[in-house]
Amino acid sequence: MARIAGVNIPTQKRVEIALQYIHGIGAAKAKEICGKVGIPVERRVHQLTDDEVLRIREVIDSDYKVEGDLRREVAMNIKRLMDMACYRGLRHRKGLPVRGQRTHTNARTRKGPAKPIAGKKK
């Protein structure tokens, strides 16, 4: 089992699919990485040589932000918005939708479970 960017990559899957197990790499970036390294997309991970795995690792480390670094950057961006006290930061702080969605109904994922209101029983 190959280990790239701190993630165990499944060996039986195609390289293009297996790279998507890394946080921060989707379908487009996986194809791009395969193109840079010169690996056919349909090749399986267990067919890769150690040199090819090393080249994939180097490309990801030099060109992309993945896993912990990406998570940390996203968290820092949200924290920066909250510290600035701009509209988006206030929405994050209150646990409400940030991108303009309605909250009169819906938004249960962001707001959490519905809180019962006293005297509302029928």
Curated annotation (Swiss-Prot):
Pfam families: Ribosomal_S13
Stretches the record annotates as Disordered: 94-122
Organism: Rhodospirillum centenum (strain ATCC 51521 / SW)
Record flagged with keyword RNA-binding: yes
Protein family membership: Belongs to the universal ribosomal protein uS13 family.
An annotated GO cellular component: small ribosomal subunit
Name of this chain's protein: Small ribosomal subunit protein uS13
InterPro entries: Rbsml_uS13_C, Ribosomal_uS13, Ribosomal_uS13-like_H2TH, Ribosomal_uS13_bac-type, Ribosomal_uS13_CS
Single Gene Ontology MF annotation: structural constituent of ribosome
